[in-house]
Amino acid sequence: MSTPENMAWPAPAKLNLFLHVNGRRSDGYHELQTLFIFLDHCDWLRFHINNSDLVDIKPALADVPPEQNLIYRAAMLLKQYSTQPLGVMVELDKRLPMGGGIGGGSSDAATTLVALNYLWKINLPVDELAELGRQLGADVPVFVRGHAAFAEGVGEKLLPVEVTQKWYLVLVPECHVSTAEIFRHKDLKRDTPKQNWRELQQGNWHNDCEPLVKKNYPEVEKALRWLIEYAPSRMTGTGACVFAEFKHEHEAREVLALIPTWLRGFVARGENLSPLHVVLQQVYA
């Protein structure tokens, strides 16, 4: 294994196996219930530590100014915990789509927090690191904590859970869905009754954002219509990605082989423990 100073750190994708919207609070945020799992399909980040006091990212993401880049913002948040001139050049191998509902930006931010917490020797406990992550986005803490979780509230209440391991075919429609736009929309269904985790384990899962996204983004509706011919399918998060689950890898790959030219997709295994935390356990071993 590479030494921590030159190794690649994974930033895994996530799926929301369901997303139930229970209501909207007076502050505008939504009460949700959702189930997060990780996939073994990842962005990869290398962190080249220096004492320049600068945070540099290569290649720069097109159309994303540095101060809006979650990797940059995560590193700058962490720098506040040291008086040393900490610097880093982050090398990003971007494989997860942006605006896809599989957590690409949030996962990159979490991996930056976790890796630099170690490499910069800041050594914040995981609770503090997750709280920093929450400042960057509602999904960042689950990536920081690194275990499949049932989430409630505005996503801040996380119950670690074990989910039966399956294989997933994820399709990536050629569109970018704005999470903020979907949650602002007057037609979003916001009245799914809350259930406890024991009740939810019985199934009847759905995604309350899916009907609205299908209506406003024909590419998502078209992808779901194609995929549902082969297996029960749903959208993850606020989209645009959609997924179907399979018991065996070969079943998922057989459907992937049939994918039409207007679609992209990948097959990945569902994980209860984040690939990031598998690496972290090796680093601290």
From Swiss-Prot:
This is 4-diphosphocytidyl-2-C-methyl-D-erythritol kinase. InterPro entries: GHMP_kinase_C_dom (IPR013750), GHMP_kinase_C_sf (IPR036554), GHMP_kinase_N_dom (IPR006204), IspE (IPR004424), Ribosomal_Su5_D2-typ_SF (IPR020568), Ribsml_uS5_D2-typ_fold_subgr (IPR014721). GO terms for molecular function: 4-(cytidine 5'-diphospho)-2-C-methyl-D-erythritol kinase activity; ATP binding. Keywords: ATP-binding, Isoprene biosynthesis, Kinase, Nucleotide-binding, Transferase. HAMAP family: IspE (MF_00061). Pfam families: GHMP_kinases_C, GHMP_kinases_N. The gene is ispE. Catalyzes the phosphorylation of the position 2 hydroxy group of 4-diphosphocytidyl-2C-methyl-D-erythritol. Its EC number is 2.7.1.148. The lineage of its organism: Bacteria, Pseudomonadati, Pseudomonadota, Gammaproteobacteria, Aeromonadales. GO terms for biological process: isopentenyl diphosphate biosynthetic process, methylerythritol 4-phosphate pathway; terpenoid biosynthetic process. Pathway: Isoprenoid biosynthesis; isopentenyl diphosphate biosynthesis via DXP pathway; isopentenyl diphosphate from 1-deoxy-D-xylulose 5-phosphate: step 3/6. Disulfide bonds: none annotated. Belongs to the GHMP kinase family. IspE subfamily. The keyword ATP-binding applies. It catalyses: 4-CDP-2-C-methyl-D-erythritol + ATP = 4-CDP-2-C-methyl-D-erythritol 2-phosphate + ADP + H(+). ATP binds at P97, M98, G99, G100, G101, I102, G103, G104, G105, S106, S107. The active site is at K14, D139.
